[in-house]
UniProtKB/Swiss-Prot annotation:
Family listed: Belongs to the ATPase B chain family.
Pfam families: ATP-synt_B (PF00430)
Protein's gene: atpF
Subcellular location: Cell inner membrane
UniProt-listed InterPro entries: ATP_synth_B-like_membr_sf, ATP_synth_b/b'su_bac/chlpt, ATP_synth_F0_bsu_bac, ATP_synthase_B_chain
Transmembrane regions: 13-33
UniProt lineage: Bacteria, Pseudomonadati, Pseudomonadota, Gammaproteobacteria, Alteromonadales
Protein name: ATP synthase subunit b
Length: 156
């Protein structure tokens, strides 16, 4: 191996080239690589953060959906209770109204029956007196007639 001036010149040129590259080419290249690494790392961190935010949002949405369902079920249950209460109140009111109408009808029937009885008593008394007049073939004076009718009405 012969070391000659060409090899020595090539070595010096190579060292200058390496120094030049290390001084002027390497730092911008390393800066670009580091910047790209930083952007990639930031992108991955943002992606991780976005995944966590998505999971949190899904969890919140699920919780809100559960709360909404529970609230809806509670409202439906209250509405059903209120419906049953209204139906019961309406039934009670209808029963009371029915009882009132029945009592009123019975009172009217009783009053009509008493009136008919009284009319019947008077007619029977009048017929009895008329029959007695016919049998006796005589007329009874008005005062006596009144007394007899009143007594017959009281007896009947």
């Amino acid at each position: 191996m012969n070391i000659n001036a060409t090899l020595l010149g090539q070595t010096v040129a190579f060292i200058i080239f390496v120094w030049f590259c290390m001084k002027f080419v390497w730092p911008p290249l390393m800066n670009a690589i580091e910047e790209r690494q930083k952007r990639i790392a930031d992108g991955l961190a943002d992606a991780d953060r976005a995944v966590k935010d998505l999971e949190l949002a899904q969890s919140k949405a699920t919780d809100q959906l559960k709360d909404a369902k529970a609230t809806a079920n509670e409202i439906i249950e209250q509405a059903n209770k209120r419906k049953a209460q209204i139906v019961d109140e309406a039934k009670a009111e209808a029963d009371a109204e029915r009882a009132k109408i029945i009592a009123q009808g019975q009172a009217e029937i009783e009053a009509e029956r008493n009136r008919v009885k009284e009319d019947l008593r008077k007619q029977v008394a009048t017929l009895a007196i008329y029959g007695a007049e016919k049998i006796l073939e005589r007329s009874i004076d008005e005062a006596a007639h009144s007394d007899i009718v009143n007594k017959l009405v009281a007896e009947l």
